[in-house]
Amino acid sequence: MTASVGGTGRLSRARRPGALAAVLAVAAVAATACGGSPGTPGPPSAYLGTVVDRPVPAGIADLPLTTDAGQPTSLGAWRGQVVVLADFLTLCQETCPLTTGNLLMMDRAVSAAGLGRRVRFAELTVDPGRDTPSRLHAYRKLIGAPANWLLLTAPPAVVERIWRYFGVWYQRVGEDRPPAADWLTGRALTYDVDHADALLYLDASGRLRFVVMGAPNASGAPVAPALRRFLDAKGLANLNHPDASTWTAADGLSPIAWLTKRQIRTVTSG
């Protein structure tokens, strides 16, 4: 069974939608038609996610993050660009590789539309204890991420503060038995991280404007062979038999089109 709205990275576990629901209850606005010229993309469907209009305060935007190259950055450093931010961990076996595959397809479409400098894709770990910059860099090479793709970590307290602000829950849990082997080191895993599957869209002024919660439909997405082999039974089911309520790369592009006021066509992988 795959997750839909409020879904988790480990789909066998209980969903925890309450935190994000509280955020959206405060921030949600009606998804009305765009008042621009004909052909200008309007807000995405309410079926996909929730339109919001919420500032990200300096206390969150300026928290220090570190890229896979070991360079300092922050959410505020990307102001001036539309930011697509996802939570993930490099050792996720069920949904994160699929989210990454969809984001790669979205990145290609954005670049083909001439919007590469206006849109930034970023993934911030929910497993800072293991996801060091060097490990994130290995993940970058594994998935073939473009140079402008942001893979981020931070001290645990910073990661927790950022995701708590956005209403994205996660928690460390025991590893299944028998334990899976780390795709990078080959060593047996000793724990896992349950987490929500969140896709957050920030506009060029740094305001949170749209939220998608749920597992991805990565049919046709470029999932790295090593990560495909790393998927567990639930992950393979998510990849090969996605639930009807999951989001596709084309779905993920609609908030970007709305925020950039540009039509964007999906570019197939390969």
Please report, for each region that a protein language model flagged, where it lies by residue:
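Short, small/polar residue-rich loop motifs at catalytic or cofactor-binding pockets
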Residues: 58-60, 82, 194-196
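Short active-site neighborhood of thiol/selenol oxidoreductases, capturing the structured segment around
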Residues: 75-103
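Sec/Tat-exported extracytoplasmic proteins
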Residues: 82, 88-89, 107-114, 143-147, ...
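Structural microenvironment flanking redox-active thiols in thiol-disulfide oxidoreductases
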Residues: 100-162
